[in-house]
Amino acid sequence: MIQGLDINHREVFVKANAKAGETFRMDLQSYTGTLHDEFHLIVDLEEHDRKLRKAYYDIAVPMYGLNRMKEDDKIRLDLETALTDTINLLDLRMPYSKEFYASVEAAEAHIQEAVYEKMGGYEEVIATCIGHTHIDVAWLWTVDQVRQKSCRSFATVLKLMEEYPDYHFMSSQPKLYSFVKERHPEMYQRIKDRVKEGRWEPEGGMWVEADCNLTSGESLVRQFQFGKRFFKEEFGVENKILWLPDVFGYSAALPQIMKKCGIEYFMTTKLAWNEFDKHPYDSFLWEGIDGSRIFTHLITTLGVGQSESSFFTTYNGMLHPDAIMGGWERYQNKEINNDILI
């Protein structure tokens, strides 16, 4: 298995320098969910110019960032000038000509100096970006599809790690790892290798991302018992974080249970999804019934095109200026912390 393909993963990198006449075979397996519609699969073979793609994103990222700045901000005015000068250097009369590539090189050199060297490196605010995939073990699909989806998603991560040496990834739910171990032991070994490198983080505390409203106290304890034991035995790591991005509510006894199970930190999202009685804190100490305290953080990441005033935040953040800048704008505890989680 090479990787998964879906609406967010539309490309498969085949080879860096293919030779004329080389043949590549690719087998596809598809699943349409509960929809009974007819879908048409269209495949194109593309040649990617890495320098051209880099120049595109180096221009696009600050351009999208402008939309979140006030019109009279000095940084915005300077950025508009730098972007205008960069675009004016491009010769678009004959794309892919010698003159075109020379102009792209000149534009890239200019934006690197004018934007990324002179305006970049602002360290008073930090966005810690964590690669992550959220998979529901039980939702609108069969358990067999969960098994397959786990393998596809983890294969995609391993493929991205080959292409991007600086890419780091975190994933919870030992149950998903057990699916991969059963179906693709060779992939599971590659995951273990990445864990040893420090690029793959098996973390999350529980066996699955469990409901915490209806679940009994004993069941919650066993979630931690089975989850922490699996990650310790399989990867040699001791979980300290309860990672529940997609759960809607929590028992008041949970801080006590977490403390007793060796959990020090808690991350969630949906407690901040109230439209009217908005939760006043994003980073705080959650005190349980017995007085146990757990450091808790609510994700503040915004979706692409989403306003700061929206009550909705997402644990499926895109690496986009709207998510990063919007996440800081949305964060309510700037006086105690300058590092947000994306």
List where the protein language model places each region.
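Catalytic-domain carbohydrate-binding cleft regions of carbohydrate-active enzymes
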Residues: 1, 5-342
